[in-house]
């Protein structure tokens, strides 16, 4: 079907159903283009909780739509592609958290938002890549178990050395592709460019970066920087906003494999179908909902 026809159908259905469309920065360009709000996990979770619309089409992956449902239980949250998952989120289970609590009873669980609702429900507070350092630093307990991402955890550990932090062994398979050699090669090809990377990258990659931050923080940094060239170390979906907001600047992706296949599953067709058929509705068990909402609300409260 013609792209413009699809877009018009989406706009019409959105109005009819009083729906809100949000998209993560890693979505395909066309999906970001039709979204009401585009951003990182923290920004979108706040938007979904604060907006009045009763129907939310979440163009992202499962854990993100799940978080939106937890924060807005009375809203209808739709995920255009139900099999858009996250391998990192699947690297930890609720049982793992229970075992950690038994083994380390004095430690608090700080859980990255890239996790299932059942894991969030057993955690003390949730964080995103944009506020992980702040959450860990300000959390009242000095003994922390950080899960599931060991690379983000390692970044936090370095920023907050005064705390005793135990790391879980999960990682993002897309960001994990970037190696130290890739950064060195990119720097030699573009000596005037600043290196901006996501904290899900390996510690040795983060070490070589000029700036480390969430997708929104990377975009904000490039927007306000006086520099004209940037090497980007995160999923290539961010290039859409970077180029749109900075037509006079140059952006080079750090590794050609910076594509998250799950994030790319949502299409204009599936967004249209989500609105038309009101699918796929995200539901969270009441028992899980309660604990997960408490941990997510704690994050929003802490900022």
From Swiss-Prot:
The Gene Ontology CC terms held by the record are: cytosol
Q: EC number(s)?
A: 2.5.1.72
Gene Ontology biological process terms in this record: 'de novo' NAD biosynthetic process from L-aspartate
**One of the record's GO molecular function terms:** 4 iron, 4 sulfur cluster binding
Q: Where are the transmembrane segments?
A: none
Q: Which InterPro entries does the protein's record reference? A: NadA, NadA_sf, Quinolinate_synth_type2
Where does the chain bind iminosuccinate? Answer: 24, 41, 112-114, 129, 198-200, 215
Pathway assigned to this chain's UniProt record? Cofactor biosynthesis; NAD(+) biosynthesis; quinolinate from iminoaspartate: step 1/1
SUPFAM superfamilies this protein is in? NadA-like
- Cite the binding residues for [4Fe-4S] cluster: 86, 172, 260
Protein localization = Cytoplasm
Residue pairs linked by disulfide bridges in the UniProt entry: none
EC top class, as a word = transferase
The note on cofactor binding and number reads:
Binds 1 [4Fe-4S] cluster per subunit.
Entry keyword set: 4Fe-4S, Cytoplasm, Iron, Iron-sulfur, Metal-binding, Pyridine nucleotide biosynthesis, Transferase
Which chemical reaction does it catalyze? Answer: iminosuccinate + dihydroxyacetone phosphate = quinolinate + phosphate + 2 H2O + H(+)
Q: Which cofactor does it need?
A: [4Fe-4S] cluster
Q: State one Pfam family annotation.
A: NadA
NCBIfam families on file: nadA (TIGR00550), PRK09375.1-2 (NF006878)
Q: What does this protein do?
A: Catalyzes the condensation of iminoaspartate with dihydroxyacetone phosphate to form quinolinate.
**Family recorded in the similarity comment:** Belongs to the quinolinate synthase family. Type 2 subfamily.
Q: What name does this protein carry?
A: Quinolinate synthase
Origin organism is: Caldicellulosiruptor bescii (strain ATCC BAA-1888 / DSM 6725 / KCTC 15123 / Z-1320)
């Amino acid at each position: 079907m013609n792209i413009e026809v699809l877009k018009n159908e989406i706009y019409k259905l959105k109005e009819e159903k009083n729906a809100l469309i949000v998209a993560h920065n890693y979505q395909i360009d066309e999906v970001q283009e039709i979204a009401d709000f585009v951003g990182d996990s923290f920004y979108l979770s706040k938007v979904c909780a604060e907006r009045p619309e009763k129907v939310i089409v979440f163009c992202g992956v499962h854990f993100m739509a799940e978080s939106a449902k937890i924060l807005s239980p009375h809203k209808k949250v739709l995920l255009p592609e139900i099999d858009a998952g996250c391998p990192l989120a699947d690297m930890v289970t609720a049982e793992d958290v229970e075992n950690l609590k038994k083994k380390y009873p004095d430690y608090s669980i700080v859980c990255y938002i890239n996790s299932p609702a059942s894991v969030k429900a057993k955690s003390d507070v949730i964080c995103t890549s944009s506020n992980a350092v702040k959450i860990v630093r300000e959390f009242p307990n000095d003994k922390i178990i950080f899960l599931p991402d060991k690379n983000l955890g390692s970044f936090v550990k370095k920023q907050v050395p005064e705390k005793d932090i135990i790391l879980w062994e999960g990682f993002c398979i897309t960001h994990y592709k970037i190696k130290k050699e890739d950064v060195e090669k990119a720097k030699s090809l573009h000596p005037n460019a600043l290196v901006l990377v996501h904290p899900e990258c390996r510690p040795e990659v983060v070490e070589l970066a000029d700036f480390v931050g969430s997708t929104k923080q990377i975009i904000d940094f490039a927007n306000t920087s006086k520099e004209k060239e940037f090497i980007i170390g995160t999923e290539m979906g961010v290039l859409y906003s970077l180029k749109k907001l900075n037509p006079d600047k140059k952006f080079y992706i750090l590794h050609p494999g910076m594509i998250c296949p799950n994030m790319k599953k949502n299409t204009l067709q599936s967004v249209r179908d989500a609105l038309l058929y009101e699918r796929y509705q995200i539901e969270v068990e009441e028992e899980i909902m309660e604990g997960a909402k408490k941990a997510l609300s704690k994050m929003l409260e802490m900022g």
